[in-house]
Each structure stands twice: as C-alpha cells, then as structure tokens.
C-alpha cells in the first residue's frame, strides 16, 4: 500500500514509519509513506501557509495555492489512482467496517488540516471522502491520519504475522474482543479460566465467543443492535447474562 500525506508537520509521521507494526511494514516494503509539506509550495519569502477567511471571524484557514499544489504533486506520485481523504470532524466516523473498506485501496492521499480547516472548494474539487476519528476537536489532522494508517495497514496481506489477529480483534466481527490471559496461571489469587488450559479447542472457541458477546452486552450494548445473532450466539449471550446476574447478587 502507498500512502501520500499532506501535512505542515511531516516529521510527525516518523513515529509510524520507524516503529511498531507500521514500521515493520515499511521495512518489508508492504507500506510506503511519502509526505508533502504545503510550505514547500509557497511563493513568498515568508513561506506563508495560512490566510484570512472571507466573512471574518476567529482563526485562519490553510492557504489555497500551496495546499492545492501539494495535493496535485501527491496525485502525480501516487501508485495508480489514489483516493484522496481529508481528515475532518465533519467526515464519516471511522469504524472497523470503514477501515476494511479503505484497506481495499492500493493508494491513499491523506490531507491533514490545520488552523480552522481548508477552503470548501478544495474539498469539493480535490477530495474524494472526508473521514473523522470521533466527535472531538484536535489541533490538526496528523494524529487522525496516523490512526487511519495504523488501522488500515493491518489488513494489508503480509503485514501481520498471523492474519487471524486482524480478523479476531475487537470490532472485526462487530463484537468486542474476549479477555486474554498469559502466564502465570494464578496472579494475586486470580486464576486463568480452566477452559483455556483444557486443550479442547471447541470449548475454548465457544468460551471466547460467549465472553465476546457478553463483554459487548456489558460495555457497548448498542453494537448488538447492528447484528443478526445466530441461535447459538443468542443462547451463549443469554447464558452469559444469567451467569453475570447471578455473580452480582
């Protein structure tokens, strides 16, 4: 996958190109990230990248000419046709389905806004989609862009040692993930559930599914409303709820 980033602070992206799963993907040649700074496309000696909004009001907007030139340069460098994304609070909220959808693209261009945002005509003429990581305001689009890349690259074949890790994570099937345990067997008097040490893979699979359903019911019940549970899943969820209610009496 190729990702082009338009940012006034391209140095921030070394945190994902040099470290962790994304860094390993870069080293393996499975992910390539190029950055363009609108400041490098300015035409004045002060390298100005902001401008006043028409109609007045507080704050500044990103200047059109340097931003548009940076976008055009990124498009020419893309591996094939790239989907252009503007990270924006007004965009579609990123979720697991959206991540998997974006992972189908060979190339993405991510525009990281600053100040009060960008000229609406840039969005209309240059941007394919707007995406948001949540209903809150940040100082720029760099962190949302890095979040998007980190989530999407997990679905690039070969990035994860075990692709099942991506398929079984929280939200991959619309549910929260089940609890996980490692050594020691007993920690401060709390033991690992016996079923996980039984070696019976069928029982372990059912336990994990039940815990995943139950944890979703406890913590994010609205997610269950989006799912069509099978009879077996309904049975496991009902069993979890009975056991949970009995444990708090």
Curated annotation (Swiss-Prot):
Role according to the record: Specifically methylates guanosine-37 in various tRNAs.
- Which EC class, in a word? transferase
Keyword Thylakoid on this protein?
Answer: no
Question: Keywords of this protein's UniProt record, alphabetized?
Answer: Cytoplasm, Methyltransferase, S-adenosyl-L-methionine, Transferase, tRNA processing
* Recorded catalytic activity of this chain's protein: guanosine(37) in tRNA + S-adenosyl-L-methionine = N(1)-methylguanosine(37) in tRNA + S-adenosyl-L-homocysteine + H(+)
Q: Which gene is the coding source of this polypeptide chain? A: trmD
Q: At which positions is S-adenosyl-L-methionine bound?
A: 113, 133-138
Could you identify this protein by its name? tRNA (guanine-N(1)-)-methyltransferase
Q: Which GO terms describe its biological process?
A: tRNA N1-guanine methylation
User: Which GO cellular component terms are attached?
Assistant: cytosol
Subcellular locations according to the entry: Cytoplasm
Q: Which organism is it from?
A: Photobacterium profundum (strain SS9)
- State where it is primarily located: cytoplasm
Which is one Pfam family of this protein?
Answer: tRNA_m1G_MT
> Could you cite one Gene Ontology molecular function of this protein?
tRNA (guanine(37)-N1)-methyltransferase activity
UniProt keyword tRNA processing present: yes
Its Enzyme Commission number(s) read: 2.1.1.228
Complexes and interactors? Homodimer.
Matching InterPro entries:
Alpha/beta_knot_MTases, tRNA_m1G_MeTrfase_C_sf, tRNA_m1G_MeTrfase_TrmD, tRNA_m1G_MTases_N, tRNA_MeTrfase_TRMD/TRM10
Write the lineage as a comma-separated list. Answer: Bacteria, Pseudomonadati, Pseudomonadota, Gammaproteobacteria, Vibrionales
Family under the similarity heading: Belongs to the RNA methyltransferase TrmD family.
């Amino acid at each position: 996958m190729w990702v082009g980033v338009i940012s006034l602070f391209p140095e921030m992206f070394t945190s994902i190109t040099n470290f962790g799963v994304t860094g390993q993907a870069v080293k393996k040649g499975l992910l390539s990230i190029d950055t363009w700074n609108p400041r490098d496309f300015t035409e004045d000696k002060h390298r100005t990248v902001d401008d006043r909004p028409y109609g007045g009001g507080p704050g500044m907007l990103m200047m059109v000419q340097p931003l548009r030139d940076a976008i055009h340069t990124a498009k020419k460098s893309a591996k094939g046709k790239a989907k252009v994304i503007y990270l924006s609070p007004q965009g579609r909220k990123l979720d697991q389905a959206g991540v998997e959808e974006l992972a189908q693209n060979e190339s993405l261009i991510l525009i990281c806004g600053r100040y009060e945002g960008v000229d609406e005509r840039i969005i209309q003429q240059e941007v394919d989609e707007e995406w948001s990581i949540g209903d809150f305001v940040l100082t720029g689009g760099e962190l949302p862009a890095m979040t998007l890349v980190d989530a999407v690259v997990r679905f690039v074949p070969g990035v994860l040692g075990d692709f099942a890790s991506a398929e079984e994570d929280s939200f991959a099937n619309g549910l929260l993930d089940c609890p996980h345990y490692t050594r020691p067997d007993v920690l401060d008097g709390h033991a690992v559930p016996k079923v996980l040490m039984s070696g019976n893979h069928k029982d372990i699979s059912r336990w994990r599914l039940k815990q995943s359903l139950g944890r979703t019911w406890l913590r994010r019940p609205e997610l269950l409303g989006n799912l069509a549970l099978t009879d077996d899943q309904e049975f496991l969820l009902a069993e979890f709820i009975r056991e949970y209610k009995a444990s708090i009496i």
